[in-house]
Every structure is written in C-alpha cells, then in structure tokens.
Amino acid sequence: MTMLRVRSRDGLERVSVDGPHITVSQLKTLIQDQLQIPIHNQTLSTNRNLLLAKSPSDFLAFTDMADPNLRISSLNLAHGSMVYLAYEGERTIRGGPAVTPAGSFGRKMTVEDLIARQMRVGRQEKAHCDSVSFDRDCANAFQHFVNESLAFAVKRGGFMYGNVSEDGQVEVNFIYEPPQQGMEDNLILMRDSEEEKRVDAIALGLGMRRVGFIFNQTVTQDKKEYTLSNVEVLLAAQLHAESELKEWVTAVVKLEINEDGGADVHFEPFQMSDMCVRLFKEGWFETEIGPEDDPKLSKLKKEVVVGVKDVKEVDNDFFLVLVKILDHQGPLSCTFPIENRNTQTTMRALKTHMERARSLPFVKRISDFHLLLFVAQFLDVSSDVPALAECVRLQSHVPEGYELLIDSMANTS
C-alpha cells in the first residue's frame, strides 16, 4: 500500500493508494472516497503554488495533472510524495473524532478557549495592495548582489520605499539595506535608528515612504516544500505589523531551476494576511523555533480553527496573499555604492561618482538614494536632508551651499 500526502487549504492529509501505477482519475476517486471532496471540484498539481491560486479560473494554469489517464508514476510520485489539492465549495467530514463536551455539562471553558474558537484562520482571497511595481535599477542592484556576490548562500534583506496610490498600487523606487547578519536559514536585522532617521528624512523630501520589505531565500531552501518558512513568516509579520500600512508588501527573491537546467532569478511579492498580522500583534505566535520544527508550519501558543480542525500549527501558505508584480523606470539612479555591504563607502567613491557624471546637471548627479544617504551623515537630519532630497524630487536648482559641501567632500579623498 502506498501513501500520498495531500495538502489543501484544510492542511495536510493522507490518502492510501494501491501503488504508483494508478492514474490521475483513479487518484481523484480515492480522494473523493477518503477526503469527501467531489471529483468535479478537484484540481491537483505537484506545484505548491496551486494553494496560492485565488479563484477557479486561476486553477486552470496548473495542468501537470489535468490528463485523467496520466499515471502518477510518470510525475515521480511515490510513497510519501506530496500532491497539492485545490477545490471549490465546502466539504463534509464524516466520522470525526469524539468531542469532549464543554460548557455547562462538560469541561470548564476559559476565556482563552472562547477566543481561540472564534479565531478562524482561512485563506484571504484579496490583497489590500492591487499591484507592486519595482524600479528596474534598484531591483536589479539587489538581485545582482545576492546572486553574484552572495551566490544565494546567505540571506539579505532591505526596506522598500516608494508610493502607494489611492487604488492600492504600490511603487518601489529605492531599497535601503540596513545593517544585518545574513545566514543560510535566518536573517538578523541590526537596525541603526539614527541611520533610519536619515533614510526617512530623505524619503520625506522625495515624497515617498516605507512600503515593504524584500529578502532573498537561499539555494538550500529551494528543496523545501514551502513558500515562506516559519522564521520568514515571523519576520514578515513583525515588519508588516510595525508599519501600520495595510498595503505593505513582502517580496521574496529566489533562484529557480528552469526547463533547460539553468537558474533564473524570480521576484515573488506577497502580503501577509490580515489574520497573520493580527495573530502577531496579539502574541499568538511561538517565537522560539527549534531545528526539529517543520519550517513549513507556524506554531501558535493556542489552538485556532483551520478548515474543520482545531490546530496549533498552521501551514504558512494560509498567511500569504499573492500580489501582481510590475516594473517601471523610476526617478532615481542606482549607481552609487550601496550602504552596509561588504566594503565601507568612502569619499573616494563619492569623487568617482561625481566625476563620472560630470556632464550632467548637478541635481542629476546626486539623484541617487544611496549617495543622498552617504551625504546625509554630514547634514542636519531635520532640515537639510529633506531640503536636499526635495531638490532631487523637483529636479530643481541645488542651493550653492549644498553643492559646495558635496564637492568639497568629494575633493577630500
């Protein structure tokens, strides 16, 4: 007897099959018999992204198991393999476990029990963010570093800054990379409050704000069966909750093997669901994660309801809401050395940058967030920094005092 693991919006379940010689049609019949999901409602795939599909029309994109006569052995499915299942409608569970009575004639219910029973975790169908568009230069600078310099061996992250339109479209125009320690399976931000004040002052002058967080996954994670790990969910939920911005975007950069055996870099933007952010704010997540914990499951301190079950572990995919991705050419360049990387930025770098762009108007030469952040160390954060950034936003004449200061800094190298 062969056992297949079936993951759906209700969590992880098991289906017993006669062996890998059965067809997709026979597998669907077994799922109907054992999990009570009608055959005509089922969509099966070996692609975990099926669980992120929002509507039946989205299910149509997953065709690897669409042929009812296909033998599952041809999909390399064997004992213990994972199959992803999406279905329409509700399901009826028969033969459920015995229930311990609660209330007046059974176990005494606490306030926490009542709250937990009301805390139902389901898939959020629609994001607050309609789409996210990345400035090509800043996105390329980030992915190039994690690909070429870090080889996707350790994690790297950055805060995304830009604008949010009235209809929920997010535009990312620069990425600030805070001090951090990246490891194979974790990312520790060593945030510098003074530096972040300068970043926010620049954003203010540019008419922008913090709109999200971006990080890469490492190559060792590519073999795991999750979209975000439990550690990544915790960090994403923390930063989303801190932002108080409902359109806040979490973007993941990953390396994936293409059909030709080569590697492609992919950007995947999400929003953490409202329920995920609420659970984090209210302290439901277990924050101590051990090496024996399953990375695709988030542990909670109390039970919540997922589908028809009371659970203390939730599939991370339940907390993710897909966001459409676009790109654009923003108003800033991205050629100045980026902060907090392997080498410290020096006055020599400023001189090289200014000389290389000497044919351009002065305001164009300084229209780079990373240059502005470097210069901001020597300016008043409450007045000079936003004033200089505003010149960049308006592409207006830069006051002579700022121009002289920047030129003198460059000439000290």
Curated annotation (Swiss-Prot):
Phosphoprotein in keyword set: yes
Key words, A-Z: Phosphoprotein, Ubl conjugation pathway
Domain (MPN): residue spans on this chain: 131-272
SUPFAM superfamilies (alphabetical): Ubiquitin-like
A biological-process GO annotation: proteasome-mediated ubiquitin-dependent protein catabolic process
Protein name, entry field: NPL4-like protein 1
PROSITE patterns (alphabetical): MPN
CDD domains referenced in this protein's UniProt entry, alphabetically: MPN_NPL4, Ubl_AtNPL4_like
Domain of life (superkingdom): Eukaryota
Family: Belongs to the NPL4 family.
Classification via InterPro entries: MPN (IPR037518), Npl4 (IPR016563), NPL4_C (IPR007717), Npl4_Ub-like_dom (IPR024682), Ubiquitin-like_domsf (IPR029071)
